[in-house]
Design a protein with these regions (language model features):
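Short intrinsically disordered coil segments
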Residues: 36-38, 88, 133-138
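Hydrophobic residues in beta-strands and at strand termini
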Residues: 21-25, 75, 122
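A broad, structural micro-motif
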Residues: 34, 66-68, 113
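Hydrophobic pocket/interface hotspot
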Residues: 31-32, 90, 128
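Hydrophobic beta-strand-centered segment that forms part of the acyl-chain substrate-binding groove
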Residues: 50-87, 91-98, 121
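HotDog/MaoC-like acyl-thioester-processing domains
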Residues: 2-19, 80-82, 93-145
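Catalytic strand-loop segment that frames the active site of acyl-thioester-processing enzymes
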Residues: 2-52
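Basic side chains
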Residues: 24, 38, 47, 70, ...
Length: 145
C-alpha cells in the first residue's frame, strides 16, 4: 500500500517538486473521469520535470540512466475534466545506494485524487545493470527528502 500523505506538521518540512498540468479531453474515459492508465503518464511527466527542469538542477550534470522498478497507485477520488489545472507533488521517501522511492500526490488545493509511489533504480545503460547513485544525484534527491 502507498504510504499515506505526510501529516500537516511534517509536510511543511519536506520540499516537494510541483508539476502542474491540465486534464485533457483525451484523458477522460467512457465513465466521465480520467482513465486509470493516464495517471502513470501524469507521474512520468512529473518525474521528467523534476529530473530535467527543476531549478535545483541548474548547473549540474544530467542524471544518468534511471529505470522504474515498481509503481503503486491508490485512487482516492475521481478526477474529472475541469478548467482549472491540477498538480503532481513529488518527494523522496527513501534513498538507497542504487535506488530511491518517490511519493506523489495528484491534487488541487482541496482534494487529493491519487496517492502513488515509484521505486526508481539507477541504471548503467551501457552495461545494462544497476549502478550506484553518484554524489550529484544523491544531492538532488536529498533536497526532496
Amino acid at each position: 500500500m502507498v504510504q499515506p500523505a505526510l501529516d500537516t506538521d511534517r509536510r511543511e518540512e519536506v520540499r516537494r517538486h510541483i508539476h502542474e498540468f491540465q486534464v485533457r479531453f483525451g484523458d477522460i474515459d467512457v465513465l466521465g473521469h480520467v482513465n486509470n492508465c493516464r495517471y502513470l503518464t501524469y507521474l512520468e511527466d512529473a518525474r521528467v520535470s523534476m529530473f530535467r527542469l527543476d531549478p535545483l538542477r541548474q548547473g549540474t550534470a544530467p542524471l544518468k540512466g534511471l529505470v522504474v522498478a515498481r509503481h503503486e497507485i491508490d485512487y482516492k477520488r475521481p478526477l474529472l475534466l475541469r478548467p482549472d489545472p491540477v498538480r503532481v507533488e513529488t518527494w523522496v521517501t527513501e534513498l538507497r545506494a542504487a535506488s530511491f522511492t518517490l511519493a506523489y500526490e495528484i491534487r488541487d488545493d482541496e482534494h487529493v485524487y491519487v496517492g502513488a509511489s515509484s521505486v526508481i533504480v539507477a541504471y548503467d545503460l551501457e552495461n545494462t545493470r544497476a549502478r550506484r547513485l553518484d554524489e550529484d544525484e544523491i544531492a538532488l534527491l536529498e533536497a526532496y527528502r
